[in-house]
Amino acid sequence: MKSSTTIITAYFDIGRGDWTANKGFREKLARSVDVYFSYFERLAALENEMIIFTSPDLKPRVEAIRNGKPTTVIVIDIKKKFRYIRSRIEKIQKDESFTNRLEPRQLKNPEYWSPEYVLVCNLKAYFVNKAINMGLVKTPLVAWIDFGYCHKPNVTRGLKIWDFPFDESKMHLFTIKKGLTVTSQQQVFDFMIGNHVYIIGGAIVGSQHKWKEFYKLVLESQKITLNNNIVDDDQGIFVMCYYKRPDLFNLNYLGRGKWFDLFRCFRSNTLGAKMQALRIFLSRK
């Protein structure tokens, strides 16, 4: 069985292994390169076609973990290619007119002080669009899944191949809270400043055509956010996208706080699995 979905992901070492509590960082924020690769090993066990963006030094390690499965690894120097936008992010993060709007407890979240973190989080649609434009995607559907999405061994639920008949006329975002209603751009900014999370950034699914639409929308939303002297990770940007084009999206509820239940809720095209997903949806309030 061949999946209808290509998985795209990326990993770049932004120094997160040094974000330890004894250095003043928030508890449980530190993750070394080795930890990230241990998470990736679980995702990499899937036999779906995968396209992975990384730095030149990490390419052999990615290829070794995939071990002959259909894989394309693309190397890129993000520090060089995106140095201007990184500098702009950093300038806003250090601007008191931005930081004074944040609650003190939010100041330790990396989206408010790490330009590398914000940059990498905001490149997901860029990476997918680049892979599509390079002609690397051969399947109808494309899924972005974070390199470190599989924190625990059972996240993929023992699947060998991940496949689900997502509606190709929509982009599919995944939520951990019900009731997202956005009525103004200012409300989106309030969500960003207050760190209100509805949409996760760890998984996004769409057809190749819809990804191109989504990429343009992401770029527009990122520019608006920066021009208003605000920075945020992908979660806030995706809320902005939803506000601007609600017709483009399906919001798929994973369950309250269930960040890592993608493969449980959307695991095959069989009737039984669909019924299981429906039961999960109805039971999670």
Swiss-Prot record:
Gene designation per UniProt: htrL
Name of the molecule in the record: Protein HtrL
InterPro entries in the record: WlaTC/HtrL_glycosyltransf (IPR011735)
Induction record: Expressed in both exponential and stationary phases.
Pfam families: HtrL_YibB (PF09612)
Organism superkingdom: Bacteria
Disulfide bonds: none
Organism: Escherichia coli (strain K12)
